[in-house]
């Protein structure tokens, strides 16, 4: 399980979406609406998640379904970013982890 500080979601789908990061105790951190071909980023440490917490990304299509990523992540103050891409249509889409980026200096 990768340890990251931030989660980036890139909308490569054909719909407006929003995304949230959810912890085991129900605590969550949500994005604003993310238009087509845009990206958003959430800093987990600024969102109130303690280090070591396991979280999962959940994507919701506007007027469509919601889908969780297959990968769980662990919160850490290490500057790393998990990058996810969303592709498909509002009723048939996938959420894919495409990279773990190192901290930028």
Residues covered by each model-derived region:
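Intrinsically disordered, low-complexity segments enriched in small/polar residues
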Residues: 1-105
């Amino acid at each position: 399980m990768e340890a990251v500080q931030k989660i980036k979601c890139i909308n490569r789908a054909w719909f407006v979406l929003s995304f949230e990061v959810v912890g085991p105790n129900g605590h969550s951190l949500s994005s604003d609406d993310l238009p087509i071909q845009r990206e958003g980023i959430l800093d987990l440490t600024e969102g109130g998640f303690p280090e070591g917490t396991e979280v999962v990304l959940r994507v919701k299509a506007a007027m469509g379904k919601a889908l969780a990523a297959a990968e769980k992540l662990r919160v850490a103050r290490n500057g790393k970013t998990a990058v996810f891409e969303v592709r498909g249509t509002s009723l048939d889409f996938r959420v894919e982890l495409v990279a773990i980026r190192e901290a930028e200096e």
